[in-house]
Amino acid sequence: MSPLTAGQAGTSFTIDYEQPGSGQLRARVTGRRGGLETLLEYWYAIADEARRIGADMLLVVDELAGDPLPPEQLQGWVGAMAGQGFEKFRIAYVEADGSRIALLEMAEIHAREHGYNARVFGNESDAAMWLRHGER
């Protein structure tokens, strides 16, 4: 799969896709973190690719540089994801910067309240294990 490079003014990101197994999509996101619009842009791109290949499990590895969104924008992000089909995916999200895990766990709680089967992890091996074998 060829990578996607995109981003708005002042931000840029690249998504490298792999298919580690049947029904799975691994998306590694690198580059510069932007605002809510950038976050939505890369998540929509990942969902499009997952639908294109027929994946139902997403492993998203976030290696973006820059400051995370504030909590109120993370809540807005969860709401903006409605109607995009994310409810159909099992999503394991890996945050490379361990200091951000607590903030992202709040987003995980909001996502679960909105019907998403998603978890946040600090490392890829735990995320991959949950994706394949964790509680459904």
Describe the predicted segments one by one.
Residues S2-R136:
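Amphipathic, Lys/Arg-enriched alpha-helical "gate/interface" segment within cytosolic domains
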